[in-house]
Every structure is written in C-alpha cells, then in structure tokens.
Swiss-Prot record:
It comes from Aquareovirus G (isolate American grass carp/USA/PB01-155/-) (AQRV-G). It comes from the Viruses. This is Inner capsid protein VP3. Homodecamer; each decamer is made up of two conformers of VP2, called VP2A and VP2B. 12 homodecamers assemble to form an icosahedral capsid. Interacts with VP6. The lineage of its organism: Viruses, Riboviria, Orthornavirae, Duplornaviricota, Resentoviricetes. Pfam families: Lamba1_VP3, zf-C2H2_6. Inner capsid protein that self-assembles to form an icosahedral capsid with a T=2 symmetry, which consists of 120 copies of VP2, with channels at each of its five-fold vertices. This capsid constitutes the innermost concentric layer of the viral mature particle. The keyword Zinc applies. Residues 21-44 have a biased composition (Low complexity). It is found in: Virion. The gene is S3. SMART domains: ZnF_C2H2.
Amino acid sequence: MPRRPRRNAKTSDKAEDAQTLVAPAANASVSSTVNTTTSPTLAAGNESQQRAGIDPNQAGSAGVGDAAPSSRVDNDGDVITRPTSDSIAAIANATKPAAVINNAQATALVPTSNPHAYRCNVCNAEFPSMSAMTEHLRTSHRDEPSTLLATPVINAAIQAFLQAWDGLRLLAPDVSSEALSKYLDSTVDSSPDLIVEDQGLCTSFMLIDNVPASHLSPELIGFTWFMQMYQMTPPLPEGAVNRIVCMTNWASLGDPSRGIEVRLPPPTDNTVHAYKTVLSQGYVASSQFSPLTFRANTLLMLTQFVLSNLKINKSSTFTSDVTTLTVGRMICSFEARPELLALAYPGRAVLPVNTKNAQFLATAIPDRIGRIDRANLIGGEVSASVECMELCDSLTLYIRENYLMLLRSMHQDPTRIVQIVNECARNLLNSSIPVNLRPSILCPWFASTADLRLQQAIHLVNISSNTAAALPQVEALSSLLRSVTPLVLNPTILTNAITTISESTTQTISPISEILRLLSPTGNDYAAFWKCIASWAYNGLVQTVLSEDAFPDSSQSITHLPSMWKCMLLTLAAPMTSDPHSPVKVFMSLANLLAQPEPIVINVDGMHQTTPASQFSHPGVWPPGFINPAQIPVAQAPLLRAFADHIHANWPQPSDFEYGSAAQGSGNLFIPPNRMVYPWPNAPLPRMTVAATFDSAMSQWISTTIAFFIRVVNAPIMAPTVNDLTRRTITGVLTAMRQVKTMTPFYIQHMCPTELAVLGSITLVPPFQVPFTRLVQNDAITNVLVARVDPTQRGDAAVDIRATHATFSAALPVDPASIVVAMLCGQTPTNLIPSHHYGKAFAPLFTSNAMFTRNQRAVITREALVCARSIVAQCQDDGFNVPRPLAGLRQFDITSAAAAEIWHAVNDAFKTAFDIDGALLDGMGLYGDPRIADISVAYLQYDGRVTREHVPPDQSFIHRALLTTENTFLAEMNLFNVGAGDIFLIQTPTNGNWAPMVPVAHPPFARGGPNVNVVGNHGTLAMRPNGLEPQLIDNAGVPRDIAGDWIYPIDVLQVSVSTFRDYVWPLVVAGRVRVRIEIPHYVYTTHYHQPQTTFTDAQLVETWLAGIDPTGIPPIPFSIPIPQVGACITSRRVYHVFAAQNNNNSLFSTNSSSIATVFGEDAGVSPARWPALVDPNYQFGTNELPNRITLYGSLFRYNFTYPSLSGVMFMRSAE
C-alpha cells in the first residue's frame, strides 16, 4: 500500500535561515550542489526504495523508507516549531570551528543528499547504503518511531529505560492467569477437612475376648472350629473374659480417618501413654502417669476422642436379609468389610448351643434390625437420610450427630449462594440456579459475622507474633489484581511524550536522560503499584512506605537537579502508599533541599530541617508549618508555603464503598460491616465505556504536583545555577509529563474499587482495615493493638493492651519510580467494555469453593478457641466460668507456661483433625497468659483516643460434645481403663473366689474410723532405741506404731515410698498392717492367673512400689483368677490389692460360649447396654448419656452430596 502524502509544512523565514547556516556533517557529500533548504520529496523517497528493492509495505508507519526523514514534520504530520532561542544557538554554533561541534549538534543536522555513509539517528550506527539502514530500522527500531527525532543521547536513555521495564512482560495476562489458578487451588487446599464420611459402624468401643476361652466342652470346641473354618465372625465375643475396650475407628469404612486415634489396649496391658500427653515430657517415666496432671491429660484424651469421631454416618448399599429370624429386613451389606455384618446385627445370629450369648440373642426383637420403615428412594431420588437399627455406641453417635448439627449450621441454601455470589461480584456475573438441584446437598460454607471477626482478630494475633506473615497476603492480592484488571502499564507512553522535547543544553547531564534513569524500577519492582493497591485492603496489618533509598540526600540543595527530580517522584507517588506519614515525609524531602534558603520551624527536640525526611514517621514530629501552612511566612519560604498549601488542597480525600455480601457475614473490626475504606475518591464503574479523565483526584494531584515543580524550576533561587536552556528543557519535560493521556486516574476512581470489592470477598484472609486519616494530626493512627487476655482479669502491665503486641504495622517498602510510571503510563484496550471484561475476569473466582475457605476456617477457629480455653480453664480453680465436670480428677493449679503447653496440644490436635496448614491458635500460646485467654483489638490515635473491639467467641458445637463426653467419662471411666476410689493393701489369703475390682462388702476401714491413723505429710519414720520397732509420725505429729490401720494419701506415698517399702510393706505382707491409699482416680491393669495353682501378688505389688517416685506412679495392678466353666480344685492364693469401689463396668461377659461360670467372676451380656435390641419399651431417638453408654441403637445414615460452587449455580459469564 503506498503511503499517504505528507502535509505541506509551513515554516517561518527565520527558521529557514537558521537551517541554512548549520554546518554539514562530517560524512556529508563534497558536492557543491547540496540542497539545505528542503527535505527530499516523496517521489525521491519512493525512487530510492525501488532502487534498493524494498517493498513500501516494509517501511512501516513511520516512513522509515524515506531517503531522509524530514526534520520539520513530526510523526503525526504536525509542523515542528523551533523556538527562536534554539535558532540563535544554531547560528552561534555555526560560527564555531568544526573541532568544537559536539555530537548532539552534529546529529541534529539536516540530512544531505548522496552521503557516503548513512547514520542511524537512534543508535548512531553507520551503514553503506540506504537499503541496509532501512532494514536495520525495520528490524531493530520499528516499535520506536518517536525516537527517530531524538538525539542519540536521549535515544540511549530511552533504550535503557525500556530495557529496565522489560520485566513487565512477567505480569502479562497469561502469567497472571496461571498465578490466579494457583492461588485458587492453594486456597481450596487450605480449607479445613470438614467432610469425612464413614460407611462402617458408628462405634468407638470394641468387644474383645481379653482372656481366651479354655476348658470348653467337646461340643463347644467343635462349634468354635466350625466358625473359624468358614471364617464366620461371632456376633459377640466368646472368651473366658470379654471386655469393652475403647478403640476409635476400628469399624470405620470409607474415607480416611482424621489422623487422630484413641486406641486403648485391654486392661491386661499398660495404658498410661494415653494419660501423659502434656506436663509429663522429660520427667515422668514411660511406665508411669502423674496423678497431679491427670485431669489435664484426661481432658486431652477425651478431646482426641471427640475429634476422631467428627464424621458423617454415610449410607451404603442395602440388601434384603434372608436369614430365618429377620427375613425381609433391609440391612447394610458392608461390601468392603463383610466381617462387619455379623457385628452390626447380632440379633440375626442363631447359635446352636445354649450359651450366655445364645440366651441373650434369643431376647432380640427381629423388628429392631436393619432399616426402619423408610424407602431409600423417594420420587426416583435417593433420600437424604435413612434410619437404621444396628451396632452403634450412644456416645459416638451423639458426637457425630452433634457434628452434623455444626455442618448444618454452616449450610448455605443455593438461592442464598447465588445472592451472595452476585453481591460479591457486584452483579457483574449472570448466574442462576439449576432447577434440578437435589434436596440432599450439603454446602458447609457459612460463617457468622462474629466468627469472621474472631478470625480477623486471630490473624492479628498471629501476625503480631510474626509480622512477616502479613506480607504474603499483600503479594497474593497483588497477583489477583493483575490477573483481573484491564489496566496495563506501557512505559512507551512516557517516552513518546518526552522525546518531542528539544534538549539544547550545555549541562553535562541530560535532563531527559536523568528523569528516565530515575524512573527505572529499583530492584525490578514492577509490581509496586499493585502492591500499594493491595495494601489498602490490609492497612491494619501492612503499611506500604516509600523506600528510604528513593529519598533525596538531605545534604543536597534544590539546585541539585537529580534531588529535585527525586522529590517530585516521591510527591507524585506518596498518595498511593498507606503510610499515614507520607505527606509529611514528602514535605520534609523538599524542606531538606530548601533548608538554607527557606528555613522553617520544626519544634521537636533533636530534629531539624536537615533531618532525613524518612525519620518524620510519627505525628509528634510533624512540623507546625505542615500542620498549619499559615505558620510558614510566604515572604520567608514561598516554595515551602506553596508546597504545604498544595498538599493540603490536593491530597486525595478518602472514601469507602460496599464489598462482600451481608448474607456472607463481615469480618470488619474497625470499619462498618461490608464496607471497605479507600484512600482516593471513588465513583461507580461505567458498564459500557471507558475514557481518560482529567478531573479526577489523581489527575488533579498529578497536574498540580507537576505544576508546582515547574514553579520550582523557574523560581529565582534556581537562576544562578541552572541556565535558561536547561530550565526550558526541564519545563518542557514536566509539561509533557503533565499532559500525558493516561488511564490510571480513571482506573483508580472507577475500576479499582470494583476490583478490590470483588477480590476482597474471596481472599483467604479478608481485608483488615483501619480508617485512612488524611492530614489531621490528632486523627493519625499510631498503633493497632491486640490483647490476648481478658481485659477484666489483667493483673500486671506485662499484658496490658498498650504495653504489648503493637503491630501497626509490618512495613513494606515500595519504589516510587515504579508507582509514578504506573500513574503516567496506564493503558486499557480501546474497545474495552468493562462489564464484559470483568464478567469474564471474575467468573473463575466463583467456579470453586475458594471464596468460602475463610468462612470454614473461621468456624474451626471458633471451635478450637472455645475448646482450648475451656480445657485450660478446667485445669485451674479460677479463671473463666466454664463447666468443670472433671473437677474431681487431681490437677495442680497450672501456671501460664503449663497452660501454654496445654493450649498448643489442643491447637495441634485441631490442626491435625481438620488437616489445617499454617497457624490456627498458635499466636495465642506464644505470649500472654492462656489461662485468661480472650481477644480484644484496638487502634490508638495520636490524641489518645482508643477504639477498642472485644471479640468473644460464639457457642461451640464441638465443645458441647466434649462436655457430654466428660460427663460420660465420670460414669464410664472403666471403659477407658481408669478406676475411681481408693485402693487397699491388705493381706487376703483365700481358696475361694476373688474379685478385687468388685468389692462385695463395705470398705474395711475409712478415714476417721476407730484406731485409724493418717500418716503425716512426709511419711516420716521415728526410730527408737534398744531394739524397739520404729514408729510412723501421723498427721498430728505423734509417733504411732506401724502395726494397725493407716491412711496413706498418694502424694505422701510418692515422697516416702522408700520408707514404705522397707518398713510398712513387710508388715502388710505379714498381715500386721492394713493400708488404705487415697487416690481418687488411677490407671489400672489386670493380671489373670489360673486358680488351680498357688499364687501371690506380692511380687506384682513390690514391682509397682519400685516404680513409684515423686513424679509419677505405675498403673495399679489387680490380680484376678480366670473364670472357670467347670468344677475345679483351687489352691491357696494370697492377694494384697483390691479397690474400694466397683470398677468392673468394662467387663462385658465371662465364659460367654458356655452356659455358666462355675468359679470366678460371673457376668452375662447386660441387657442394660442393649435396650434398643431387647427392650420392647425402648423409645427411639433416646439414650442414657451421660450415665451409660449403650452399644446398640437407631441412627441415621445420610446420602449427602457436597457440590462445588460451580455445581450449585450456573454462570453464563464463565463461558
């Protein structure tokens, strides 16, 4: 395509004369016929291209194929007007000898025809022919048409500037989209593991044969072999001694467990490991437990028990039963674990031999087996729940149903979800609900405002312990902004503007080159602009500040042009930071440069006008002239007075806008709910068009700031050191920068609020903001504070809210040059339709569950905090008013260090159970006192005003389950291998039955009884002379004979065990001393032996005594004869240990494969633990908690589905 003709240029005569007097270039033709008055014609240019064999289409839009570019017409075809001063300078230079002509003047010569060599005006490279130079221009400089009119020095500066900004390609949309996907994926991965389904049995207690059966009749032996041969699982254990053992998830099927198990061995093994989680490491032996920390460890064991059972009973395939008694009943098939079938429905079994198990199973009600009168399919859809009768213990079922209540409280209805998404997306998405959504969906995505506010306070707690943790939140939001914004940064906008400036100067430093050098990003910080915007959403956690390296040297003066440029760049960039002191800092940066000609009063001890500007970072050091510009005399300091007036008049006015959804809750602490504060004025987003604006706050700030520095350049103070030509050049550069058509001001006013509103609704950490205070000294926020303790229970200054944990805030230095380039070089697509763009950009944000992750974490934070605080409070006598079911278990009054250890144990348990990475309650245990843990946040202003918010947690579902578990533990502690009541050490020889854990009579003696002595606090022995036996000193300090009845508190026994072993225990074995050891609760073990052989438990007791020390004791050993199914001749046995009260509730049955027990403990299957199976009067849906754990009952199995957000609603904008 032929190029369009150039317009005829009309120039002044004076300019023509100046051009004719310019000396020719060194490589100009020696011909005397040199045309110096006109440019080559269009025809001549086309002819030259044809000779060179160049297609006109290859020449480019800039006309680089011309034989010689015109020096009087710019790229847009406008006439270049040359100032008279430049013409005079050219005439003067023409009279100089050739030796003094500089390169800048030489390269500005009008090209001559027929040169010997062709020189590139961009890079000064020489070429032998026009075709070679044209090809060079086409390949190397085609994208830089504006540089064809600039000098090589400026061109070199432009090249360096553009190369420095070449890293902007790293922020290209394709890279940012990848970052967006990674962020959303990582956010989903950060969500707590709320859904764990179990298709197995809902039970945490296993029925095991603790002692295998022996001495069975031949018929029973044959039947047992038959069942084993065909791998038939007996419905009930058939050992000689069968016990109920706590073992969570032993019958689970489906999803993996939560990573926490409570698996206690039968009492024949040592179980102390479960009761030494905390306050034991390093000083309690592996075979011991500490009675003084028993409550804390029991609480943690029960917490683990609850957390391991936070599951949903999942429905599975049902099949029709074909057994005789229960034919036609619908039962679960348990295809993956068929051995569970016999255990789940023991009432289906028909045992051929009359045994204890058979007698019990004969009482089973057939209708209490399998599914209860409810179809599994309703209207062609699987029903949401199915009620079944099967093996399930009531405590586990209660915990799981309580957890389901928690999930239901978090459920979001699809209609509400669409409302939330539309409001969070500012109605830029076209979303709807599919009409065929099933009623069985469960979307646990909701968190109340109270939970979100608590989570925000916890974020502040964790960040105040580690300020570096706040910076990744800004980086993440910065990446999201770059992923969705249509604004791109194009530095060539700036270079194209300033290269039209004529630079005729004798200065050694080119002004244009210097400003381009200063505008290069420091440290390749291309994203400083986006970091500033992201920091606005977290201005309570992160504070963007101008980098100290960017400030001019305070020892320089205003006549040092690089320092003046730096001051201007700081001033332009300052409103983009969230630093409340940035206006003062930029004011003082100019005051530093004007310290000698324009002195002002500082009125702060130790600070002067020459103090580096970056040190003015507190309202108390703001100069009075800045606070009130009227205090700066115009005659004495005209520039500083004008600068202060400019800042006060044009500094942007903060605003706010709506974000999020009221239905989603709000985590704002200091800002009204669902509002986001903004440091600039904002306006609604135009839906259809965009256009550059020149009346916005940012446009005004850029224009007035540059206008002020034009005044500085032309001020009388600059005249002695800056010549007129330099001032004109600088004025031209500033004017060009002021007139740049950038889209950034429009973006800040109209588009950025929408982006922040949408992204702030989906980020993992919600916006954490404090108000922007502009320029009012008394309103300036000096600290954001957090207290980890209850304000009503603070006892010393070390935990005072003003003395600790100030976190305003983590400083994030940013490069002002990068910010200024972004302000001046913003660009959007010419055909941009904002509603279409944002509809596509925001759609991926709402296709996953990422936006609800923070809600889920907020709920788990609440649950963990309530449980941790309650557990710590239960380990002391005062503190928070919480229920204390386990107050009877011994526990020393914990210190703050011990409380911190307990707190971390609970925190780790919750993080493991819900698979949470990162911090949960970590910061709460690092400082302060967890015994009075409570959270208050506040911000402190300069005038002393404190805005405080107390954020107490709401009620906790898991804590409710924990309290019920604690109360149940008191009634069923034998199921956890824990005994209650004292123990006796009394010699008891017998040939008969012996049941040490089931005393059949009243205790032999008790404290306060006749002739009962209580040992003193130290168990001190009083030695007597002349062969008399030693005496024990009682609690009244009176020596008493050892023979007799003694009360020994366990702590006294621990500190005097050596005395007891040497002097008291031998008399117990001899039958002369009876001892009652006062120990309210203890871990025990059982030791079974054959009654036909001689036996004594003295050795067991001596081993037990040898393991006692002041730090702990081993489990209490009880010796029990094995129950016999036939007549036997027993031997004499001597026992020394038995319990003061019944501790045999974990005994399920004895010799259940026979009809009776002839000798030893005799226990059949208790109907009290199976009312739902055998009691005709059983009320469905009831249980006997906390008094008894039943092992069979009715439960609901659920067919929930858990869709993603894209499965709940349909978005057309996502296509």
